[in-house]
């Protein structure tokens, strides 16, 4: 979306639209710009939500886990959650075989992991990749 297209959508001229966009970036409201890829076309069409529990609750184990997952490319999202599980991970793999390999060689090798429960996504129904914003 160009600044000109955005300006037309918000009914402003390009200069104030550009200024507002830059201000929102500076103030941290806009964190970045991303292309949204079709996981199936990238040969990573299997989505798994993995609910994970640490071996025990300690800041050190939590920190170790959060550091350990940063460079694991199959983990595309990670949320620290309340309730029965400590974290929910969104994992993208090619198929069941590659997911099993991922669990054996990557997630299963993180010392702080105590238990995990995998939920396999059958169909993505909604994914807006955004945050709702009330205008006005």
What is the role of each PLM region?
Residues 1-136:
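A compositional/biophysical signature of low hydrophobicity enriched in polar/charged and small residues
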């Amino acid at each position: 979306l160009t600044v000109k297209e955005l300006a037309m959508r918000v009914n402003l001229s390009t200069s104030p639209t550009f200024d507002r966009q830059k201000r929102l970036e500076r103030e941290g409201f806009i964190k970045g710009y991303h292309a949204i890829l079709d996981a199936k076309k990238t040969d990573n069409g299997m989505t798994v939500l993995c609910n994970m529990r640490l071996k025990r609750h300690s800041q050190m184990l939590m920190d170790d886990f959060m550091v350990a997952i940063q460079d694991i490319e199959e983990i595309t999202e990670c949320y620290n959650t309340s309730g029965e599980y400590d974290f929910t991970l969104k994992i993208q793999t090619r198929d069941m075989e590659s997911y099993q390999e991922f669990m054996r060689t990557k997630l299963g090798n993180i010392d702080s992991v105590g238990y995990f429960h995998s939920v396999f996504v059958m169909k993505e129904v909604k994914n807006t990749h955004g945050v709702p914003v009330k205008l006005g």
